[in-house]
Amino acid sequence: MSPNSKGVEILSIGTELLLGNITNTNAQWISEQLSQLGLNHFRQSTVGDNRDRIIKVIQEISQRSNLLITTGGLGPTPDDLTTEAIATSFNVSLFERPHLWDEIKQKTSNSKLQDNSSSLRKQCFFPKNAQIINNPRGTAPGMIWEPIKGFTILTFPGVPSEMKTMWKETAFDFIKTKFSDSYSFFSKTLKFSGIGESSVAEKINDLLNLKNPTVAPYANLGEVKLRITARAKNEVEAKNIIKPVKEKLKKKFPKFIFGEDNDTLPSVLIKELAKRNETIVFAESCTGGLLSSSITSISGSSQVFQGSIVSYSNELKNSLLNISEDNLKKYGAVSEEVCEAMAINIKNRLGADWAIGVSGIAGPNGGSQEKPVGLVYISIAGPNNHITNIKKKYNSTRNRIEIQTLSVNVCLNSLRLILLSNSK
């Protein structure tokens, strides 16, 4: 798309999106695709299932953009209004495509959907000169249509699997041929743990002002990401643009950067333990198995993960982890002493190289002035039962899942740093 072009917009149609009943993953995915094509995507809109509002938005977009991509509203129900609204926006009629009706009947021949033939048939009507985008995964086709000179509309159903298939099989090549210039965007994402977004941003002010590549920080729960994006003619050229910035960042944050792109803390930790031929076990209380789940969600975790004990009650801490009743009474289940014993005892019982014990108060109830909600103890037992103890106090305004998730991240990142300092 030339520098003087108006750009691309995404219009998501569906009242369920406005009400927050479902997450709009379609717009995110399409945005990524447009970035890869190097297109000037500058606006996203969402509108409910209201014919007049859809028409108004489409007419506005047609005056300021070259390309509109819509999702949703192509189905057989009365509130599926997209195709009709688009046609009305440009004062044209819809005409039936008989071959589409034959295809829909074939797709629904063994389904109760065919009983609702009049509703299904509405999906076969399009403007006269529109190009059909076939839908191999559903009954609602999309279209490519240029209602006025210099403005093209592509429509897709709202079902993500259907939309993605149609995009890959038809739309991608069309958009690339008609709208994309010889440049594309390529990105590399660096992932940080143990440092906040503002702290990262303060240390890279000079990089945040770069034009090509651009550097942008953004944060998830317990994790910061830096996306380095280059505009280039090909991937090799982009990598050469990105490389010096990436190397500078890795020198500036040698301990905080744990991975790139699709890396996760669990996957990085599994890879490091496997390289060392070492194993790990967990004794969990406040995280309730979330730590174990984070590891076992990664393929290949069986190489290093032997198992865990989720000892939520004091009785199980005593019977399964051999935590003495005296220590439980003296220090309490949420204490450094008990957490340390949890890690050491499960390590020795299961014969692993490493063990992590975690105990705390995830809330919203159960806290006290001495031990408030958000207090978490983590103990990591290594070779020769060497212990590393960590105490975290999370803000009590955080909810239960956030405290558990942050605790899991600290467990994994703390062990990663220990392994990093003891590289074999």
Curated annotation (Swiss-Prot):
Pfam hit, one: MoCF_biosynth
Top-rank lineage group of the source organism: Bacteria
Stored InterPro entries: CinA (IPR050101), CinA-like_C (IPR036653), CinA_C (IPR008136), CinA_KH (IPR041424), Competence-induced_CinA (IPR008135), MoaB/Mog-like_dom_sf (IPR036425), MoaB/Mog_dom (IPR001453)
Protein family: Belongs to the CinA family.
Protein name: CinA-like protein
